Amino acid sequence: MLLPIGTKEVWVKGYQCKTTLTTPQLVQTFLFNTQLDKATIIKDIGQSHFLQTIKYPPVSKISLLAQEAITTDTSTHILGYRCKALQLKWTDGSVYDILYTDELSLTVNQFELGFKNVPGLVLSYTITSAKDMRVKYQATKLDLSPLSLSLFTINSELYQAIDEE
């Protein structure tokens, strides 16, 4: 059984993407533009606020081993959208079990690096590590309303800068 430990929100406008993970311990926001080679990470831990700029996408030692469509006898729907199943296996031993819809088309669908080749919008995914630890994310709301560009603006004066790792 998977217990909810937080929420993750995703916003997309044009080539920009913003994801915010909120848990009782921290709030972490990740912002990137697919036309640039960097991303910004903001971490709020208690009263401490940190900002980090990183190369994005990163030079990764992990690569995709296999991508396999999974056919099922049942039809899965999330938020009213028919979903297809896909499994991604990675060289680090992790596995992503993905449910996506091809009924929606966004300019940025890879709000996770692993979604780059998924032919639609991911609405649910479970990451299983090589040590069999599982984390599941599932969309609970989808809003197709226009977004303000200010949503992607950061006031860097509010954060302590940390060096790129």
Task: Please report, for each region that a protein language model flagged, where it lies by residue.
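Extended soluble regions of mature proteins
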Residues: 1-165
